[in-house]
Amino acid sequence: MPITSKYTNQKIEQIISDVFDVLEKHDASAELALMVVGNIATNIINADVPASKKKEIAEQFSQALLKSTK
């Protein structure tokens, strides 16, 4: 069963494009871009996820990342 999202592909792709534009503006290498994106993910989890769910969300995020890079 495919995963459904409450967000449109268009909205997701636009945000991705905007983030890429910022990274390109700063001439970020792949290493720097991954550091920035990782820090953003950490900041979002720390700011918006209840303490009791942080580990679970981080594990789900890391598993999704691993699956998407195969």
From Swiss-Prot:
It comes from the Bacteria. InterPro entries: UPF0352 (IPR009857), YejL_sf (IPR023202). Signal peptide: none annotated. Pfam families: DUF1414 (PF07208). Belongs to the UPF0352 family. NCBIfam families: PRK13689.1 (NF010242). This is UPF0352 protein PBPRA2586.
